[in-house]
Amino acid sequence: YKILFKRAFNDSIATSQKVSLALSQFVRSMVSYQSKFDEGLAHTNDPRRPFSNFTNSENRGKQLFFSPQTNCAQCHTTAAFIGDNSRNNGLDAVLTDLGVGGINNRNNDYGKFKVPSLRNIEVTAPFMHDGRFTTLEQVIEHYNSGVKNNQYLDNRLRQGNRVRRLNLSTSDKVALKDFLLTLTDRTFLTDEKFSSPFN
């Protein structure tokens, strides 16, 4: 690595500050915006309109994702499909993992966890903070019919005092998964600069 440090910093001595700077720059370079979704968005500039490069099922899934019926886009809000806050998504009726609340000791943060990016979700299993789901179908079914009520459940998953049920049909669940797969950036996943330096 001495040669690389010399190229990057004009000095071959590796210090913790230089390693920190190099890692920070590397992480900032990891941008994933060349997916099928991004291609469609570039042509329409509106994620709610049908994309000509999508199948009917992918467009239906996209419509569901951004619809009030599912509210997916209420938590996965940014271009990276990530949330700005931690949320309690009803994994457990009785909280055994207090999440953020276990760290900051605030009751209203019990059971809350960071909302992850959905970019490249096709290759990021297992899912949820504890890895309890191994497939996207399980995740979709959780939000469709498996959300557990607890006193700290995010309001987006409530309908009055009850848990919201999405009541998605089998074809809607398939469509939602098909849409999520359009967020996979194959160029990013195969980019040599992100490959293991030890191979």
Residue ranges of each PLM-predicted region?
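C-terminal capping alpha-helices of c-type cytochrome domains
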Residues: 2-7, 11-35, 122, 132-199
